[in-house]
C-alpha cells in the first residue's frame, strides 16, 4: 500500500539538504545501483562530436538558440523565483518551459561537449536551486493555487492547470543534466522537488488526477521511476507503480471532450487496442507511458513490457505519418494520413521510441527513429536554425511557433511556447539513440559524419569515427579507437530499405548481411580497425491505401522523405509516374539532397529532402499524385514497413 510509506514525510533520509541561498554543496548519492532485471540497452555516449551537414544544422541551433536562451528570455525564471508576487501572464503549462529547455540542453551537450552549452545548463541549475521552495516546490504558482488547490476551492470555477506536468519536465531535465555532466546539485534539486510532490499527494492523500489534465500530470510517474533508479528510494518505486496501476484508471473531467473519462492506457494496451482507442489519446500521455519502460527494467514485471510493446506497435501502425511524425494535430486519431502533427508530438514520440528501442533491441525501431529524426524532427526547425514550427504538415507550409503560439509567451520570455521550448530536445535527441551499449557489445544506429565516444559494459572507452556524406550517399567508413583491445559484438544497423548492403572489416567482405536487422560482428576490436559500409540507396515508396487520400505516393531516398515546392505552374495536383520517380537524377542543390525529375506532362521538377523543402516557409508537397503502379503495403507487426515499397 503506497500510502503507508513514509508517513512522516519523504525527505528525511536525504543528508545535508541545500542551504538557501544557492551556493550550497549538494550531497553525492551513494545508494546501491538498482538492478536492471531485463538487460536493456544503455546510452553511455560521452561525446557524439557530430559533424557534416547535420552537424552544421544542430551546431547552428546550439549557437543561436541554446547558448543565448537565458539572455534572450531574461524573465524565464521570474514566476519560479517569485511565485507569490509576479505580474506575468502565465499559460497553464508555464512551468514546463525551463524543464523542456534543460532537457534539450543536456542532449545538446552530448553532441559536441561545448563548454558554452555546459555554462548555460549549469546556470539553469543554479536558477532552479535559487527558485526552489523550502518544501521542494519547483513551479510558478502561488501557494493558494498550486497543485490541485484551485480545483478544490469551492469558490473557484477552473479546469485546473498542468502543475505536476511542469515539474516533471523540470525534474527530468535536472536528472538528465546530472547524468550527463555529473552535476550533483541538479540531482539534489530534482529529489527535493519529487519529495515535495510525494508529500503533498501520496502522504497527503491527494490524487494526481484531482488536478485534472491527467494526460499531462500523470507524467510524474516517469520521474518517480527514474529517480528510484538514481537513489534507490523504495517509496519512489511504489509511487510509480501506484500511478500506473491505479491513477491511470481514475476518472476526471476532460477539457477537450467535456466528458468524464479515465486514461485507461494499461487496460487498452493489454487488450491489444491502439493508443488512439484508449481513454485519452493526447500526445502528452506518451511521457506517462515512458514509466512502463523503467518499471519493466527495475521490476522485471512482464506486464509492463507487454504493455509498452503493444502501445508502440499500435502507434507506429495507426498514427505514424509519412514524415515520421506521430498523431494528427495534438494526438492520436488512428489516421496516418491526417493533416499535420505538432512538434511536441514528435519529441514525445521519439523519446517513447528510444525507450522501446532500448527494451526491444529491434533495428526496426531504430529505422523509425531515423525516419523521424531526418524528416519530422529536423523539419520542425526553420531557416536561421533558431525558430521551430508548431505544426509539421505533409503538404503545405511551416510557420514559426513564435507566431502561431505567441499567446504562450510573456514579458521577458517572448520566445516561449510549448514547441519552441521543446524543439531543441527533438533535434538533439539523436544523441540518445545513436550508439547504445549492451552487456555484450555496442549497437550502432546513427550513420553520419561524427566521432562518437562511448564505453562498453566493461568500462572500456571506444570511439567510432564515421567519415561519410550519408544520407547524401550510402558510403560510410568507420574507424575504431579502443583504449584497450577488447572482444565484444558490434551490431551495425542495416536499414530495412537497403536491400543490397556491403560490409567490409579491414578490407574483408562480410557474409550474411540482411536488410532490416543488426549485422553482428564479434571479434577482438583494437585501435585502427576499419569498417566500410555501402548502403543501397534506391528510391522506395509509401503508396497511399485505397480509400484514404487518393492515388498518392511518398518517395524516400534512404531515410529522407522527398518533396517539391509548389508554384503557379507546379501544383499539388501535378502528376508523376512511378518509374520516373524511381529514376530521378541526383543534382547539386541547396538541400541535404536534390534530384531532378519530370512530371507526366514533361515539366522539370526539383525534389529535395523534406527538411529543406519548407524551411523558408515555402509551400511544398510530399504526398505526390501518381498512378497506382504499386500494390499498397498494409501494416504488419515486424513486417516490411509501409514506406518501403519498391
Question: Residue spans of the language-model regions?
Answer:
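Glycan-recognition and catalytic cores of secretory/periplasmic carbohydrate-active enzymes
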Residues: 14-646
Amino acid at each position: 500500500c503506497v500510502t503507508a510509506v513514509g508517513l512522516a514525510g519523504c525527505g528525511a533520509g536525504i543528508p545535508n539538504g541545500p542551504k538557501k541561498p544557492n551556493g550550497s554543496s549538494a550531497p553525492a548519492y551513494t545508494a546501491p545501483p538498482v538492478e536492471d532485471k531485463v538487460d536493456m540497452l544503455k546510452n553511455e555516449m560521452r561525446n557524439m562530436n557530430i559533424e557534416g551537414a547535420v552537424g552544421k544544422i544542430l551546431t547552428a541551433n546550439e549557437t543561436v538558440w541554446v547558448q543565448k536562451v537565458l539572455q534572450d528570455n531574461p524573465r524565464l525564471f521570474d514566476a519560479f523565483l517569485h511565485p507569490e508576487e509576479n505580474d506575468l501572464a502565465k499559460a497553464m503549462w508555464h512551468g514546463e518551459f525551463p524543464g523542456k529547455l534543460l532537457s534539450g540542453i543536456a542532449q545538446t551537450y552530448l553532441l559536441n561537449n561545448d563548454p558554452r552549452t555546459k555554462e548555460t545548463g549549469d546556470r539553469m541549475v543554479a536558477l532552479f536551486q535559487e527558485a526552489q521552495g523550502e518544501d521542494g516546490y519547483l513551479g510558478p504558482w502561488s501557494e493558494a493555487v498550486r497543485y490541485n488547490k484551485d480545483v478544490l476551492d469551492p469558490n473557484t470555477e477552473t479546469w485546473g492547470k498542468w502543475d505536476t506536468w511542469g515539474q516533471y519536465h523540470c525534474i527530468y531535465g535536472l536528472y538528465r543534466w546530472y547524468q550527463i555532466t555529473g552535476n550533483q546539485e541538479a540531482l539534489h534539486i530534482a529529489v527535493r522537488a519529487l519529495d515535495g510532490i510525494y508529500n503533498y499527494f501520496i502522504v497527503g492523500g491527494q490524487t494526481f488526477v484531482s488536478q485534472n489534465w491527467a494526460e499531462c500530470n500523470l507524467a510524474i510517474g516517469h520521474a518517480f521511476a527514474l529517480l528510484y533508479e538514481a537513489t534507490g528510494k523504495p517509496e519512489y518505486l511504489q509511487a510509480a507503480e501506484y500511478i500506473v496501476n491505479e491513477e491511470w484508471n481514475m476518472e476526471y473531467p476532460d477539457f477537450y471532450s467535456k466528458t468524464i473519462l479515465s486514461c485507461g492506457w494499461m487496460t487498452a494496451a493489454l487488450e491489444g487496442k491502439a493508443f488512439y482507442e484508449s481513454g485519452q489519446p493526447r500526445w502528452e500521455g506518451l511521457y506517462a507511458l515512458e514509466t512502463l519502460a523503467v518499471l519493466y527494467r527495475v521490476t522485471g514485471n512482464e506486464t509492463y513490457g507487454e504493455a509498452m510493446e503493444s502501445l508502440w506497435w499500435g502507434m507506429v501502425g495507426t498514427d505514424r505519418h509519412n514524415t515520421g511524425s506521430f498523431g494528427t494535430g495534438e494526438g492520436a486519431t488512428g489516421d496516418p494520413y491526417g493533416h499535420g502533427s505538432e512538434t511536441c508530438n514528435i519529441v514525445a514520440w521519439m523519446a517513447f521510441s528510444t525507450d522501446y528501442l532500448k527494451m526491444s533491441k529491434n533495428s526496426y525501431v531504430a529505422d523509425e527513429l531515423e525516419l523521424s529524426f531526418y524528416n519530422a524532427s529536423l523539419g520542425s526547425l526553420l531557416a536561421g536554425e533558431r525558430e521551430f514550427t508548431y505544426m509539421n504538415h505533409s503538404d503545405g507550409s511551416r510557420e514559426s511557433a513564435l507566431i502561431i503560439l505567441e499567446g504562450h509567451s510573456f514579458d521577458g520570455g517572448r520566445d516561449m511556447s510549448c514547441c519552441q521550448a521543446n524543439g531543441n530536445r527533438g533535434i538533439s535527441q539523436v544523441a540518445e539513440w545513436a550508439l547504445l551499449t549492451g552487456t555484450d557489445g555496442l549497437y550502432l544506429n546513427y550513420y553520419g559524419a561524427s566521432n562518437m565516444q562511448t564505453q562498453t559494459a566493461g568500462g572500456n572507452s571506444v570511439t567510432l569515427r564515421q567519415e561519410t556524406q550519408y544520407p547524401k550517399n550510402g558510403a560510410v567508413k568507420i574507424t575504431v579507437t579502443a583504449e584497450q583491445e577488447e572482444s565484444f559484438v558490434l551490431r551495425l544497423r542495416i536499414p530495412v530499405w537497403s536491400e543490397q548492403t556491403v560490409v567490409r572489416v579491414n578490407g574483408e567482405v562480410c557474409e550474411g548481411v540482411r536488410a532490416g536487422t543488426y549485422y553482428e560482428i564479434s571479434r577482438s576490436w583494437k585501435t585502427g580497425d576499419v569498417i566500410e559500409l555501402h548502403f543501397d540507396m534506391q528510391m522506395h515508396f509509401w503508396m497511399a491505401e485505397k480509400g484514404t487520400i487518393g492515388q498518392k505516393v511518398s518517395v524516400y531516398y534512404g531515410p529522407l522523405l522527398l518533396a517539391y515546392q509548389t508554384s503557379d505552374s507546379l501544383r499539388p495536383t501535378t502528376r508523376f509516374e512511378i518509374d520516373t520517380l524511381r529514376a530521378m537524377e541526383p543534382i547539386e542543390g541547396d538541400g541535404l539532397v536534390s534530384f531532378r525529375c519530370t512530371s507526366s506532362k514533361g515539366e522539370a521538377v526539383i525534389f529535395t529532402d523534406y527538411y529543406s523543402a519548407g524551411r523558408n516557409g515555402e509551400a511544398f508537397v510530399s504526398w505526390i499524385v501518381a498512378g497506382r503502379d504499386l500494390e499498397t503495403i498494409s501494416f504488419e507487426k515486424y513486417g516490411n514497413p509501409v514506406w518501403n515499397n519498391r
